[in-house]
């Protein structure tokens, strides 16, 4: 009789424990979804008109991402029909909308011999998706964007450069895991792993209790995103032998430099294929200084010189 009571007690304890874990998982999943349950639209003040860049043409494209909804992208090329030396796939940041806010960068790259494929990520501007979904969604979208862009007749056989700002830089580094054939990658104010900023935000909001929630957030990401959930830029650097240019500002309060640049430099600072650009006086937004005509050409010139070296 005593053994039977112990067995029943053990079963009840296991049931309560499992119920608690399921409840914690569902709560973490709901919190996670709520955090990314919004769309982003580029404001009028941040949007650039293609007509202001007469040296550049573009063609509109749509392609499906992993969930099946359609993303919108544009292939930018030279108005004089000059053959490009390489294809740059560019991923935008999070919060200000899609790719249309970066046209001066594309124009600079095009005038220096590159074609650029830039797209609106899930839940941004012209792309489908009720919400952005997650930070991981960024490099899922970039994976599919690269595959699509490489399949275009205009880009056939061109060396590939992955490039992005902030969330897009996270995506660019992580996309090396699925596209290690890239000749070069340029990350501007990015970081290593999507979960790092999610964990940081969770701890700031919940204090020590956040440490109890984080494992369930990780489980939700794995269940939802599969192989992409365990991706990191560091793994991408190990999979590829491409050139890597890492750009960051020490004053960045949005993506702290220790979440990306410092991690990469600890291993690769003396590696010949890595170029590190660290600014002591720049933060997140002003990492690419703006002039009256768009983005300052100082850093863009460094980026082009770096890419030229790696695309041959």
Where are the predicted features?
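An N-terminal hydrophobic leader/cap segment in hydrolases
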Residues: 16-64, 74
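The serine-hydrolase catalytic nucleophile loop
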Residues: 94-107, 121
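Catalytic nucleophile-loop/oxyanion-hole region of alpha/beta-hydrolase
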Residues: 98, 122-156
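Conserved alpha/beta-hydrolase
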Residues: 108-128
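Hydrolase active-site cap/lid region
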Residues: 174-226
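Short beta-strand/loop motif that positions the catalytic acidic residue
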Residues: 240, 246-248, 252
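Short alpha-helix in the alpha/beta-hydrolase fold that links the catalytic acid
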Residues: 242, 256-266
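C-terminal catalytic histidine-bearing segment of alpha/beta-hydrolase fold enzymes
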Residues: 270-312
